[in-house]
């Protein structure tokens, strides 16, 4: 993990509400969070705690009602007009809960994984792209010769998620958002996905990962630091061993007890 004191990506005093003006539902209350280069930050909490909303705001996928978000010390607030937004979009990878909703059923694996390169790296020729697709699939734990020509319908849930991960890392992003990447697959596949993220961290030690998860068993094996959200507020945050070993809030203790850690 990087020793830099300056976060790669940071959010400050984020508030967010949904719904019509006459019936607004606030889901985030003055929430701040950051992640450093090379760090894995786990954002945990129960359903409806605001985990996904916070991380989507941090990656520029949603806008906040108030507060600020900075990528490499440049604001991304305001979308395309902001100085940091374009850089973040080009230097981030996304992995969501349902891999099949992220893959075009008409495309073979090779085309799906290559898509970010074809959109963002027009300087690369087909040979360069093929080599990078092969490398990304290999890092994701998939044998390229066995998977390049498959369609999503030919994949198990775990295999499809690893294809999505390969696509997320194809551009060597500086930050990856993994939003519940293991919740829709079986236990054996979860172990493989966990190993895939460990391999990414080993091969690319400066890459930051923000992982949204309700599975503390997964979190304790991969995260350097934990942020606990409850009803849209930060309950506590700190190094993983400290939060899980000596929780400071009743809510965190309840999560740990429920997970039987």
Question: Where are these predicted regions, by residue range?
Answer:
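ABC ATPase NBD coupling module
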Residues: 20-22, 76-93, 107, 111, ...
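Conserved ABC transporter NBD signature motif
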Residues: 67-78
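Conserved catalytic motifs of ABC-family nucleotide-binding domains
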Residues: 172
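A short, surface-exposed alpha-helical micro-motif characterized by mixed small hydrophobic
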Residues: 219-221
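Helix-to-loop junction immediately C-terminal to a conserved catalytic motif
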Residues: 59
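Conserved ABC ATPase signature
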Residues: 151-155, 159
């Amino acid at each position: 993990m990087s020793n830099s004191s300056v976060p790669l990506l940071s959010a400050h005093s984020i508030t967010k509400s949904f719904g019509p003006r006459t019936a607004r539902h606030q889901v985030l209350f003055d929430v701040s969070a950051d992640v450093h280069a090379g760090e894995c930050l786990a954002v945990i909490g129960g359903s409806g705690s605001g985990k996904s909303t916070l991380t989507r705001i941090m990656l520029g996928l949603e806008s906040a009602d108030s507060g600020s978000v900075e990528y490499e010390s440049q604001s991304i607030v305001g979308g395309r007009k902001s100085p940091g937004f374009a850089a973040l979009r080009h230097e981030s990878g996304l992995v969501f809960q349902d891999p099949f909703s992220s893959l075009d059923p008409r495309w073979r694996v090779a085309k799906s994984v290559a898509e970010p390169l074809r959109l963002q790296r027009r300087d690369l020729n087909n040979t360069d792209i093929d080599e990078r697709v092969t490398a990304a699939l290999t890092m994701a734990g998939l044998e390229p010769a066995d998977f390049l020509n498959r369609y999503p319908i030919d994949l198990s849930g775990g295999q499809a998620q690893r294809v999505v991960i390969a696509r997320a890392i194809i551009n060597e992003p500086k930050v990856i958002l993994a939003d519940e990447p293991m919740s829709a697959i079986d236990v054996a596949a979860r172990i493989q996905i966990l190993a895939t993220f460990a391999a990414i961290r080993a091969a690319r030690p400066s890459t930051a990962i923000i992982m949204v998860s309700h599975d503390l068993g997964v979190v304790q094996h991969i995260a350097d630091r934990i942020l606990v959200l409850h009803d849209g507020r930060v309950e506590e945050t700190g190094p993983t061993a400290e939060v899980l070993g000596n929780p400071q809030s009743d809510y965190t203790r309840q999560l740990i007890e429920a997970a039987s850690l």
